[in-house]
Amino acid sequence: MVSVARLVFMLGPLLCLGAQLSSSQHWSHGWYPGGKRELDSFTTSEISEGIKLCEAEGCSYLRPQRRNILKNVILDALAREFQKRK
């Protein structure tokens, strides 16, 4: 029982100190609890030029690239295996 009390005594201040030092979200600056943001606060100036350009033409960076990465990893592994066999 003494070790449990000692553990609580040590973890309590450590938890309080960790909460103070962490970079948690502050609810001022237009944010509400739960990560919600006021929708009316967005202005047209917050839309980046890259997104405006992508509306006119297709943007490849908006498409998921996971398939290409996986394909490249598999091809590299096969190429290494082929080089080992030579």
Swiss-Prot record:
GO terms for molecular function: gonadotropin hormone-releasing hormone activity; gonadotropin-releasing hormone receptor binding. It is found in: Secreted. The keyword Signal applies. The modification Glycine amide is found at residue 34. Keywords: Amidation, Cleavage on pair of basic residues, Hormone, Pyrrolidone carboxylic acid, Secreted, Signal. The keyword Signal applies. One of its GO terms (cellular component) is extracellular space. Stimulates the secretion of gonadotropins. Belongs to the GnRH family. This is Progonadoliberin-2.
